[in-house]
């Protein structure tokens, strides 16, 4: 592969690419000018053309770009490399601002490799993909900082058929040593996981992928994402759902659980600026697919504020720099004018995180028990009165006695205060003496809190206890 990458290259007509790269050098200086220590270094995806957007990148002050290299364009026939495409990348190496670091995401299987005209079909032979990306690493050398191996391999949109952790793990195992042999300093990334897909990552570890990547890439620009990065939901087991922005922390937890304290690179984050109706996923037809331009700017600030609190997230790339067609997530409008988010990114790149507010709400509701009093003694029916307050809204209060359910109070409107009261006749039938009454409250984000009090059941003389709980 390395020999053929140095051979004369056949000319091909240039199509609209997803591409770009870097002029190496001045790296130490640029790192000194980057965001403060511990904060994610910002960048943008160049998804529109081979135009390096030199003026915009200089104005933004970011020193990272992410681009796509489509295998089917670069090697349309086995061993036959497109001179035009290679030249386009190499031209960018010299046109991008000095010190720019480049992530190249290698996608797009050629038909000769799979027999399919759909370039999102995964490689039939991982060694073919490895040979190609290894050849790129040798050809591009230090001009490319990192290689992202595939894109959203956990999604059938990018991995035709069903996502296959074992097959993708094989791709990593084949590619990693080849890239490192060609360019030892290159960082090898797990392809961006759709919406922080930590269950898929767990399966990669089970399939032996540990040791075959240097960092895990995640994507948080999920379909119809219109909530603040501070907002999240939890699964019933307490873990954040993958589509929550902050679920990159669950990705990190999976890595640590597998003894793999490597960094995370967020290679796509964004919010669309549109009032059009959602057309994708579970929420299709049920809500808007985007936010206002000012909300986008606010969410950008909040996102980088959260990332600054987690130094294991080293790089965070906005997708894309400029709106293109139906994709209106850019910092620039299609005509090149600046959205408010451009200034927000510029401020972060120059001054770092300036927010001081909390990144999300992680505490459960405040529970107030009006009755009974702690260590109260009762006989017969027991009056119970409880309320829970939470700025995110309260969805449920659960009452338990000695770990057994008494009842739930629920309200799917998630009021800021939820209350419940009853005269519990079942209290007459619990065991005599000391009992523990527990109150559990859950907010809209599925944050949970609980409090318990002790009550003493004094039975009437002559009453025989019938065990209920």
Say what each PLM segment does:
Residues 60-196, 271-274, 319, 324:
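Substrate-binding cleft and catalytic face of glycoside hydrolase catalytic domains
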Residues 126, 130, 164-294:
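Noncatalytic carbohydrate-binding groove/subsite architecture in carbohydrate-active enzymes
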Residues 360-462:
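Long, low-complexity serine/threonine/glycine- and acidic-rich segments characteristic of extracellular
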Residues 153, 281, 285-368, 446:
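Aromatic-rich peripheral "rim/lid" segments of glycoside hydrolase catalytic domains that contact
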Residues 46-59, 128-136, 198-206, 297-306:
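Short, acidic/polar
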Residues 38-70:
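Boundary/entry segment of secreted carbohydrate-active catalytic domains
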Residues 1-14:
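N-terminal secretory signal peptides that target proteins for export/translocation
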Residues 19-34:
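Bacterial N-terminal signal peptides
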